[in-house]
């Protein structure tokens, strides 16, 4: 019987040793996985940092050179200088007569300038508003020289009326 008990104890001890060895192997694999995960995380963080630096440089460049690049792009597309600045966001207004001119392509601008239709419409609207210059009195002229001295006048005995409520 002792032989059987000894064999069972041996098998039990071998099973314990096998469990311990498999536990050690598992822990080594787990440590290797964590090391690989840390390396991947470090690589990812380095790439994120590089992307953020690149984004900051791009934002800085666009904030400095962006408006000029938009104006140049609009000029290259065929817009005149004022329209190109307006496209870039300058907020300028161009008023011809009584009309606020929209943003136009340079070819459109040339055709308007050649026909002068917009100018004639503006003059006709101004005629309706101001009338014709014929038969009007001359506009006042500016006086030259020193101004005339005037004396102050004080009204004494002013009696403001009374009210009854």
From Swiss-Prot:
Chief localization: virion
ATP-binding in keyword set: no
Pfam name, any one: Calici_MSP
UniProt key word Oxidoreductase: no
Its biological purpose: Minor structural protein that forms a portal-like structure at a unique three-fold axis of symmetry, following binding to the host receptor. The channel formed by VP2 may allow the delivery of the viral genome through the host endosomal membrane.
Additional free-text comment from the UniProt record: Translated by a ribosomal termination-reinitiation process from the bicistronic mRNA coding for VP1 and VP2.
Family statement drawn from the similarity comment of this UniProt entry: Belongs to the vesivirus VP2 protein family.
Quaternary structure note: Homooligomer. The portal-like structure consists in 12 copies of VP2. Interacts with capsid protein VP1.
Protein name (database record): Minor capsid protein VP2
């Amino acid at each position: 019987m002792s032989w059987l008990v000894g064999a069972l104890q041996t098998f039990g001890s071998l099973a314990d040793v096998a469990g311990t060895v498999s536990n050690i192997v598992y822990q080594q694999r787990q440590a290797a996985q964590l090391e690989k995960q840390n390396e991947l995380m470090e690589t990812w963080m380095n790439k994120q940092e590089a992307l953020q630096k690149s984004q900051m440089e791009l934002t800085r460049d666009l904030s400095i050179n962006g408006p000029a690049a938009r104006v140049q792009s609009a000029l290259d597309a065929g817009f005149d200088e004022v329209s190109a600045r307006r496209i870039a966001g300058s907020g300028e207004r161009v008023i011809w007569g009584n009309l606020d001119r929209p943003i136009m392509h340079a070819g459109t601008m040339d055709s308007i300038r050649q026909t002068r239709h917009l100018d004639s419409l503006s003059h006709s609207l101004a005629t309706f508003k101001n009338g014709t210059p014929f038969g009007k009195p001359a506009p006042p002229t500016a006086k030259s020289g020193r101004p005339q001295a005037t004396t102050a006048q004080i009204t004494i005995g002013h009696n403001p009326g009374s009210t009854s409520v």
